[in-house]
Amino acid sequence: ASLATEWAALPDNPNVWRFKLRQDVTYHDGAAFDSEDVVFSLNRAMADGSDMKELLSSVKEVRAVDAHTVDIETHGANPLLVNNLTNMFMVDKGWAEANDVMTPHDVAKGETNFATMNTNGTGAFKLVSRSIDEKTVLTANPNYWGKGIYPSQVTEIIYTPIQSSATRVAALLSGEVDIIQDVPVQDLGRVGSTAGLKVGTAAQNRVIFFGVDNADGPTADLRVRQAMNIAINRE
């Protein structure tokens, strides 16, 4: 988070966004983070086979202005660009070259590469080990640039995938795990009333669209659709 400290569309060209990068940021292996990595990472995300390609479909070109300034030019003004970039993760170009992961692998085809099991980020936690569908272990990054901004007492994180929601809840209640997401609706009361546990909730800013078949069945009748609309409690 916050690898860019400033960003804005250029006053004379709304199709170009300029990003100022945070300085003195290093990857987990000690390599410096700079604009070359941003250009590489976004071009990699736009490559064929990338799951992130659609989010950057409006991008025409990514250019390094200097070591800590990047321009992103789009095909026409795109006010959603900054929001879409929050889903992008930076990859150290040198690390990618050294480990032959310059291009993304095709997850849909079951392909794997070095980056499937390894990573070299800039964040608060660095990867210790990863076993797909079993366990991923992270440890605190002692050189994290944001330690003074985002203080944390957590030194280790262990992710344990549990497919069954009932099993996840049981693991939480027994103390096998410390946190789960999301708590099934039917278990909110039981979890919330258990000593030492707390259910966290927050409002979401999103739209859920319900489409109805207006060509066949009961909803083909305009009156039914109007009744459904009236029945919604908008309060």
PLM region descriptions:
Residues 1-12, 43, 120:
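N-terminal lobe/hinge region of extracytoplasmic solute-binding protein
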Residues 12-14, 22-24, 38, 43, ...:
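Solvent-exposed coil/turn segments that connect beta secondary-structure elements
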Residues 20, 54-104, 131:
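Surface-exposed binding/hinge segments that line
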Residues 22, 113, 143-190, 218, ...:
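Ligand-site clamp/hinge motif
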Residues 34-41, 67-73, 123-124, 153-156, ...:
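Alpha-helical secondary-structure segments
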Residues 56-57, 189-201:
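Ligand-binding "clamshell"
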Residues 89-151:
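Gly/Pro-rich hinge or "lid" segments in bacterial periplasmic/extracellular proteins
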